[in-house]
Amino acid sequence: MDCCASRSCSVPTGPATTICSSDKSCRCGVCLPSTCPHTVWLLEPICCDNCPPPCHIPQPCVPTCFLLNSCQPTPGLETLNLTTFTQPCCEPCLPRGC
């Protein structure tokens, strides 16, 4: 059960900004790309040992997609680069009920 001690979570490569946080059922990280073109099933954690299935991360939990789909006013949204959809996020959005 100590396989994660010397290994790291697989992180998607590319220009997309990732938000990594630990998952409750796995010791590896959950990597959440903050760009909308990524599909939901690519946002599930990758574990290096036998662990329970991770929670499903709903689409609104992607930070930039949540901002673009939110009906609440978002100050500074007009300054986003709509070509890259990259924007830092202070608090990672995690699904409830894990």
Swiss-Prot record:
InterPro entries: Keratin_matx. Pfam families: Keratin_matx. GO terms for cellular component: cytosol; keratin filament. The keyword RNA-binding does not apply. Transmembrane segments: none annotated. It comes from the Eukaryota. GO terms for molecular function: structural molecule activity. Sequence repeats lie at residues 3-7, 47-51, 89-93. Keywords: Keratin, Repeat. Residues 3-59 are annotated as: 3 X 5 AA repeats of C-C-X(3). Belongs to the KRTAP type 3 family. Interacts with hair keratins. In the hair cortex, hair keratin intermediate filaments are embedded in an interfilamentous matrix, consisting of hair keratin-associated proteins (KRTAP), which are essential for the formation of a rigid and resistant hair shaft through their extensive disulfide bond cross-linking with abundant cysteine residues of hair keratins. The matrix proteins include the high-sulfur and high-glycine-tyrosine keratins. PANTHER family: KERATIN ASSOCIATED PROTEIN 3-3-RELATED, KERATIN-ASSOCIATED PROTEIN 3-2. This is Keratin-associated protein 3-2. It comes from Homo sapiens (Human).
